[in-house]
Amino acid sequence: MIKILLVEDDLGLSNSVFDFLDDFADVMQVFDGEEGLYEAESGVYDLILLDLMLPEKNGFQVLKELREKGITTPVLIMTAKESLDDKGHGFELGADDYLTKPFYLEELKMRIQALLKRSGKFNENTLTYGNIVVNLSTNTVKVEDTPVELLGKEFDLLVYFLQNQNVILPKTQIFDRLWGFDSDTTISVVEVYVSKVRKKLKGTTFAENLQTLRSVGYLLKDVQ
């Protein structure tokens, strides 16, 4: 499932956005700029929804520090600041989109989907890799029309690999994304689940193209 970081100090609006996106994304809510910056740096997210008028540290400062640290996660600013100067400043700092309040939740979702499509993280309801078809709506996997049962984190792991082809994925990044950096389990669980997915997809293009990078992580080559 898509992971979104929502940095918004208005509790009512934050909860409304959270509820509206609940069937589409896993949304992490934080309510001030310092906490937002910490989460954006330590977690793994597909998109950041960022208010500007935040306590502790304003949204412009958060965005500036993220980009200076090389964090390229798409950022959609949503704010009551509607002047052309504010919009220009946001884009100069590295924002990917800018939505002024008040807004329709439906429009917010459309903009989110557009940004995710642009970054390759969202492709309607299916992902295809060689002879594998993954349905994101039903959480099902088929290999040449034959169902293959991948449960829970197995399914999430496959989707994460397919969404990050030709990208070196450190074990720590996979662990933070799927289990959370504050999880009580150990990082060795990543190897366990990679082994499970490989076994269930034995003989597929995925199993052939998934490389283990010793002491680093994994790399899934794209389909040639």
UniProtKB/Swiss-Prot annotation:
Subcellular localization: Cytoplasm
GO terms (BP aspect): establishment of competence for transformation; regulation of DNA-templated transcription
Lineage: superkingdom: Bacteria
Stated name of the protein: Transcriptional regulatory protein CiaR
Its job: Member of the two-component regulatory system CiaH/CiaR. Involved in early steps of competence regulation and in penicillin susceptibility.
Keyword DNA-binding (UniProt): yes
Pfam family, one: Response_reg
GO molecular function: phosphorelay response regulator activity; transcription cis-regulatory region binding
GO cellular component: cytosol; protein-DNA complex
PTM per Swiss-Prot/TrEMBL: Phosphorylated by CiaH.
PTM sites of type 4-aspartylphosphate: 51
